[in-house]
């Protein structure tokens, strides 16, 4: 058994939403978490900048002798996961979008109207839509960017009227105009406001990729042990 730690990284605090699921389902695993709070948010930065930051962090994690890198950041996963795999072929590198897309495609019924919310970079990449519809073309996918969410969450502005009003600003028209029945939290920061979203839109089915990725991590560990 490989007892080395698993490396997680994100642009800031968002990737921490994966950790409780890891501790519950894979309690024997050690974790190194790198949150780039000095340079957050990534969601409005240029692709080359995101790629450069991600290479630096992955290099740090590889030098820390991790056995796997988990990109607990949708923006990075949408931008440069393949670049990271080419740069560091010696260890598995797992992005968060593919496991989430697989789960969405497999669990949502035909004709479901699925809304993806995320950063500007994630949404403009179309990564979720492509990955989901490649597996289940009968699903209707709609996407919208919510760029103010991450800065507010990083500042701890969560359980108050400011966050609720911001959620409604981005999501009211999006949900109504597209008749959305399912929302995918396409940024690992967004589980911090999942309770807000569920309270404001009680009829929505909410899918949280931060809880889904653990199953794929387990599969990779089992394959390599």
Question: Language-model segments: which ranges?
Answer:
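Non-catalytic structural scaffold of enzyme domains
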Residues: 1-225
């Amino acid at each position: 058994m490989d007892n080395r730690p698993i490396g997680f990284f994100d642009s800031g605090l968002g990737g921490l939403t994966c950790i409780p699921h890891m501790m519950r389902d894979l309690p024997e695993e050690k974790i190194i978490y790198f949150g780039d709070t000095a340079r957050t948010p990534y969601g409005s930065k240029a692709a080359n900048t995101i790629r450069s930051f991600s290479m630096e962090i992955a290099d740090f994690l590889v030098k820390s002798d991790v056995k796997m890198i988990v990109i607990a950041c949708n923006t990075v996963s949408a931008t440069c996961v393949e670049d990271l795999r080419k740069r560091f072929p010696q260890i598995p590198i797992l992005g968060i979008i593919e496991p989430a897309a697989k789960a969405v495609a497999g669990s949502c019924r035909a004709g479901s109207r699925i809304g993806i919310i995320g950063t500007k970079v994630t949404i403009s990449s179309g990564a979720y839509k492509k990955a989901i519809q490649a597996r289940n073309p009968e699903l209707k996918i709609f996407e919208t960017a919510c760029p103010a969410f991450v800065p507010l969450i990083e500042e701890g502005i969560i359980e108050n009227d400011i966050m609720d009003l911001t959620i409604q600003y981005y999501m009211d028209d999006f949900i109504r105009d597209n008749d959305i029945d399912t929302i995918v939290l396409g940024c690992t920061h967004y589980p911090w406001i999942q309770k807000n979203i569920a309270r404001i839109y009680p009829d929505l089915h909410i899918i949280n990729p931060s809880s889904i990725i653990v199953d794929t991590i387990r599969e990779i560990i089992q394959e390599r042990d």
